Design a protein with these regions (language model features):
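Conserved small/polar residues in nucleotide/adenosyl-binding loops
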Residues: 320-323
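Asparagine-centered strand-capping/turn motif at beta-strand->loop junctions
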Residues: 141-143
Length: 323
């Protein structure tokens, strides 16, 4: 049975600019058709707390708009831990690392329409990852830019029982600009203990005219593997595509797609279709139906290759684990 079909003792909460404490009946007292506090202002260099609540419970959905650029860094702390379990630019967390431009090469708003993340027209960023906590939850936003900015937000969840065996949600940001030519790009390493790898978003920026860029193979090393246990033959194959993301192999043109768990949803740059133009791509793969389980550790790499050999493109990723 789905959670919405089950009657339980869970208590819903929602933190927003209109209800910053998340208290029951703590929203606007202004009455119908009024806006008292639709946004929170975050000064340059300032960090504000968006959620601060005791557990046990679970974050269930997040919505942001307003300024959602790279200068905002989101952090999430579970159970009074000193270090964040989530730390990333807000744009990268929602799979849109090239936040200076939300319009794709065809002049349309690039929509990411997946089960876990929705990027909607008008810079509406939505997240549906479940994030459990046992003792405490704190979510902050830091403005690392030079200008004051405003953020619209609502973060919903519930206070509920959390099983002992449930994993904590983690998300980490990595970038390599450019990838060292001839070396694999590391998506994730240094993970220790028992858990699950549940997904990644990837932004790629082309740095050379070297035909198709998606020949790089994805390799997953489970526990103490010397060689990969899971090995995809190409970048497009790992992101559930094929043949260079082409809608016509003969004319070598790309076609975007956005599915429930995977996609290559945006292409930024000029509208010339051929593989060898210098463009930027946004991709995602969520392992909801097929999480990658590990007992003592996990590592994943992705080659940066084209048809004629290694490349030196810009790679940025945001990886998600539950452990």
């Amino acid at each position: 049975m789905k959670p919405y079909c089950m009657i339980s003792n869970a208590k819903t909460f929602a933190f927003s600019a209109e209800n910053p404490t998340g208290a029951r009946a703590g929203g606007s007292k202004g009455g119908d058709c009024t806006k008292l506090s639709p946004t929170v202002a975050i000064r340059a260099g300032e960090t504000v707390t968006l959620v601060d609540t005791d557990g046990p419970g679970m974050i269930q959905s997040i919505w942001f708009t307003g300024y959602v650029g790279h200068s905002f860094v989101i952090r999430m702390y579970w159970d009074n831990c000193e270090y964040p379990s989530v730390e990333a630019p807000i744009s990268a967390f929602f799979g849109t690392a090239y936040d200076e431009n939300f319009v794709d090469r065809d002049g349309k708003y690039a929509v990411l329409n997946s089960a876990q993340i929705l990027v909607a027209p008008g810079r509406g960023l939505n997240c549906y990852w479940e994030m459990p906590f046992k003792k405490h939850c704190r979510i902050t936003m830091e403005n690392r830019g030079e200008k004051d900015q405003s953020l619209y937000y609502i973060i919903t969840g519930c206070h509920c029982e959390v099983p002992d065996e449930i994993g904590y949600f983690h998300a980490s940001y990595r970038q390599e600009h450019p990838v060292q030519k001839g070396r694999s790009y590391t998506i994730i390493d240094g993970i220790q203990g028992k858990g699950q790898f549940v997904g990644v978003t990837l932004a790629t920026g082309m740095n050379g005219n070297n035909t198709c860029w998606v020949e790089g193979e994805a390799r997953m090393y489970i526990d103490d593997d010397k060689y990969p246990s899971i090995h995809y033959t190409g970048t497009e194959d790992y992101f559930c595509g094929s043949y260079g993301f082409g809608n016509d192999v003969q004319i070598k043109s790309y076609q975007t797609y956005s599915g429930l768990y995977s996609g290559m949803y945006a292409i930024y740059g000029d509208n010339r279709a051929f593989y060898n133009e210098q463009q930027r791509f946004l991709l995602y793969r969520f392992h909801i139906a097929d999480p990658i389980h590990f007992e003592i550790g996990f590592r994943m790499t992705l080659d940066n290759m084209g048809w004629t050999g290694p490349r030196y493109d810009d790679y940025t990723c945001l990886l998600y684990t539950s452990d």
